[in-house]
Amino acid sequence: MRRVIFGKVSCGCAMPYGNLDPAHMKLVQWVRFTWELDKLPTLSAALPAHYFLTSANRGDEKELRAVIERSFVQDTSWGDAIHEVNSMLNGWLERTFEPEKSGICLALRHGLRMIGASILVPDPTAGNHLTPGPCVLMEYRNRGLGTALLVESLRQLRAAGLSRAAALTKSNAPVAKFLYPKFNGVVSPGDTPALVA
């Protein structure tokens, strides 16, 4: 069963996200970063005290969704693509938590509070293994936490048997400027991601 989500798009009308047409979408420049996982050195990133990474499961889904959605909504660089991103997020999260899927969810916590997350697709044929990529709440950014999430994401993908990982993002997003170039991330033009699950 496909869930249809209604919301306001840039023109002010309400329409299902799954039916976005070019008249309702701004042109977004996407880029793809790739990492040769088997050529990376041993990956590690120290977290500050009281921060830790855990696996997330279906019981964490509501909190995970909230953290990922807030990290995008509060980041003004995503304003021109927020409706497309919301549609993609719903599809990614739905597929990740399906019982037969092998998605990996990482939760970054400060004490008991989830403050960051990363969803991984360990399928070698996937075009985007970091969906939607390391997400950290705005008030916790610029502390090395996104780097720690990226390191653990790449480490988990390598442990799952992938030799190469890819991530798709907007060309002007903070991850494209500051995070993904780390660890020898190579940038190339990206395709527009699918909008529905």
Predicted regions and their residues:
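Hydrophobic adenine-recognition pocket in adenosine-nucleotide-binding enzymes
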Residues: 134-136, 169
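Conserved GNAT acetyl-CoA-binding A-motif
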Residues: 2-10, 157-169
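Acyl-donor-binding surface of acyltransferase catalytic domains
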Residues: 1-50, 193-197
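Conserved acetyl-CoA-binding loop-helix of GNAT-fold acetyltransferases
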Residues: 1, 136, 142-159, 178-182
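A short beta-loop-alpha structural element at the N-terminal edge
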Residues: 52-67
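Hydrophobic alpha-helical core bundles mediating ligand binding, dimerization, or RNAP-core interactions
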Residues: 64-72, 89, 157
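A conserved beta-strand-loop-helix scaffold within acyl/acetyltransferase catalytic domains
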Residues: 76-129, 133-134
